[in-house]
Amino acid sequence: MKDLRFVLQRLVDAPALTQLPRYADYSLEVGEEILSAAGRFAADVLDPLNAPGDREGARIGASGVTLPSAFHAAYEQFIAGGWPQLAADADIGGQGAPLVIATAV
């Protein structure tokens, strides 16, 4: 998180984004909360999939690509958590987060 904070504050100048009307509801603290939540999701949900994913592997066959069975529940949690729509406009169901935050996630 320390490295991401440095990048957001010093390289990207994320605090300047909050001066734009589009991101008036965002602050560096909100961005850090989003990144922390994404980190918890990665540690709690995605990281445990590494070993089963390596054992089962992805397969391609006549019916398409088959992923390891544990991946499906993780994907559903990813969708339910709203992660894919993080930077999308609120008027289409997104969260309106700055793209730099969504990209870091």
Task: List each model region and its residues.
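Amphipathic, small/basic residue-rich leader segments at the start of a protein or domain
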Residues: M1-A104
